[in-house]
Curated annotation (Swiss-Prot):
ATP binds at residues 16, 174-176, 241-242, 250, 256-257, 273, 277. HAMAP family: S_AdoMet_synth1. Keywords: ATP-binding, Cytoplasm, Magnesium, Metal-binding, Nucleotide-binding, One-carbon metabolism, Potassium, Transferase. Gene3D superfamilies: 3.30.300.10. Signal peptide: none annotated. It catalyses: L-methionine + ATP + H2O = S-adenosyl-L-methionine + phosphate + diphosphate. One of its GO terms (molecular function) is magnesium ion binding. This is S-adenosylmethionine synthase. Its cofactor is Mg(2+); K(+).
Length: 395
C-alpha cells in the first residue's frame, strides 16, 4: 500500500471455548504419539455447558484414557469451579472415536508414486487429503510475525498469567483481545491505534476496577510505550459485563480459530485447521513447512515479507504446486526462490515429517497463543537453520 493504513488482528485466551476444544484435541494427539509415534489421528472436540464431546478417527496401537486427558486439560486451563458453568471434575465427557477410513489409509500408506514403482522411501506416504496451505513471514517484528498478532497474543498470555498467579483475583478463564496498528507507506508499524480487550470476571467486581487493572497491568505492561499515545483508543469489556463465559456462554469447537492460530489475517489461509491432526495431514504439516520456508527466506534477506502456497492431491507425495509471493520486496525473482526451495526443502509428507521431526508429542503447546512466532517454546518450524543453505544455493 502506498499510504498510511490501519490493520487489525485478534487473539483469544486458553479459556476461550474454541481454544479449550483445540487444546483437548491436541492433548489427546500428544498422548497417542507418546505411546505410538505412528498414530493416525483426526480428533475433534466440542464443548458446551457441562459437556465435552470428543469424536473423530484414530488408528493406533496405543491406549489412552481420554476422560482423564480431557479433565486434566480443562483443569490446567483453570475451569475448576462449578460457578463457571463448566468445570473439570463435573462436566460429562462423551467419546465417539472410529478408525481411519481404509480408503484414506491406502493412499496415505502407499502413495501414488510408490504404487507406480518409485523406490525413494520418502515417497511412500501420500498426502492425507487434497488441499492448499500457506506460510508467511514478515520482518516487522523479531518473531517474523505481524505486530498486530504478536501484541494480541501477548495480551492474552499476560492476562492468563495474572489470573493463574492470583494477582488479579476476580479474573475468569475466558478472554479476547484485538489490536489495531497504524502502518506507514512502507508497511512499517507507527503506533497502536486501538486496543480491545474483553475478559470474563467474577460478578462482584466493578467495571471501573476492571478497566483500571487491565489498562495498567495488562495493556501498558505488554505494549511498548512508544506505540501508545493520547490518541490510542481503549475498549475494555465494552459490553459492561462478562460474567457468563467459556463453554457456558458459547459452545466451542476444534478448528474455529484458524486465523488466531496463524497470521492474524495478514496472509491467506487454505481453510484447514491444525489441532487434533497428526502430521500425515498436510493441513497441519505442510502449513508448518510453509512457515519454515517463509521465515528462512525473510531471515536470509531475500524478502521483507513472503508468503508461500503449497497444494496437494490426496494419496500423492509430491505437492502439485508451490507459489511464492514477496509482495515486491524480493531481492531474487520468485522463480529463483521456488527453485531454491525445491532444493533445500523436502515437501513430500514423509519429507516434512523427517525434516521437522513431527512424530513427537509437541502439539498441545501450540493449541493456544498461536502456532507461529512463538518464543516461549521450541518449535522446529521456527528454526532458522536453512538460512545458510538458501544463501549457498542463491549466492
Amino acid at each position: 500500500m502506498a499510504e498510511r493504513h490501519l490493520f487489525t488482528s485478534e487473539s483469544v485466551s486458553e479459556g476461550h471455548p474454541d481454544k479449550i476444544a483445540d487444546q483437548i484435541s491436541d492433548a489427546i494427539l500428544d498422548e497417542l504419539l507418546k505411546k505410538d509415534p505412528d498414530s493416525r489421528v483426526a480428533v475433534e472436540t466440542s464443548v458446551t455447558t457441562g459437556l465435552v464431546l470428543v469424536f473423530g478417527e484414530v488408528s493406533t496401537k496405543a491406549y489412552v484414557n481420554i476422560q482423564q486427558i480431557v479433565r486434566d486439560t480443562i483443569r490446567k486451563i483453570g475451569y475448576t469451579d462449578g460457578k463457571y458453568g463448566f468445570d473439570a471434575d463435573n462436566c460429562a465427557v462423551i467419546t465417539a472415536i472410529d478408525e481411519q477410513s481404509p480408503d484414506i489409509a491406502q493412499g496415505v500408506d502407499d502413495s501414488l508414486e510408490t504404487r507406480e514403482g518409485e523406490a525413494d522411501p520418502l515417497d511412500k506416504i501420500g498426502a492425507g487429503d487434497q488441499g492448499l496451505m500457506f506460510g508467511y513471514a514478515t520482518d516487522e517484528t523479531p518473531e517474523y510475525m505481524p505486530l498486530t498478532l504478536v501484541l494480541s497474543h501477548k495480551l492474552m498470555r499476560k492476562i492468563a498469567q495474572l489470573r493463574k498467579d492470583g494477582v488479579i483475583s476476580y479474573l475468569r478463564p475466558d478472554a479476547k483481545a484485538e489490536v489495531t496498528v497504524e502502518y506507514d507507506e512502507n508497511d512499517k508499524p507507527l503506533r497502536v491505534d486501538t486496543v480491545v480487550l474483553s475478559t470474563q470476571h467474577d460478578p462482584e467486581v466493578s467495571l471501573d476496577q476492571i478497566k483500571k487493572d487491565i489498562k495498567e497491568q495488562v495493556i501498558e505492561a505488554v505494549i511498548p510505550a512508544e506505540y501508545l499515545d493520547d490518541q490510542t483508543k481503549y475498549f475494555i469489556n465494552p459490553t459492561g459485563r462478562f460474567v457468563i463465559g467459556g463453554p457456558q456462554g458459547d459452545a466451542g469447537l476444534t478448528g474455529r480459530k484458524i486465523i488466531v492460530d496463524t497470521y492474524g489475517g495478514a496472509a491467506h489461509h487454505g481453510g484447514g485447521a491444525f489441532s487434533g491432526k497428526d502430521a500425515t495431514k498436510v493441513d497441519r504439516s505442510a502449513s508448518y513447512a510453509a512457515r519454515y520456508i517463509a521465515k528462512n527466506i525473510v531471515a536470509a534477506g531475500y524478502a521483507k515479507k513472503a508468503e508461500i502456497q503449497v497444494a496437494y492431491a490426496i494419496g500423492v507425495a509430491e505437492p502439485v504446486s508451490i507459489m511464492i509471493n514477496t509482495y515486491g520486496t524480493g531481492t531474487r525473482s520468485e522463480e529463483e526462490l521456488i527453485a531454491a526451495v525445491r532444493k533445500a526443502f523436502d515437501l513430500r509428507p514423509a519429507g516434512i515429517i523427517e525434516m521437522l521431526d513431527l512424530k513427537r508429542p509437541i502439539y498441545k503447546q501450540t493449541a493456544a497463543y498461536g502456532h507461529f512466532g512463538r518464543t516461549d517454546v521450541d518449535l522446529p518450524w521456527e528454526h532458522l537453520d536453512k538460512v545458510d543453505e538458501l544463501k549457498e544455493i542463491l549466492g
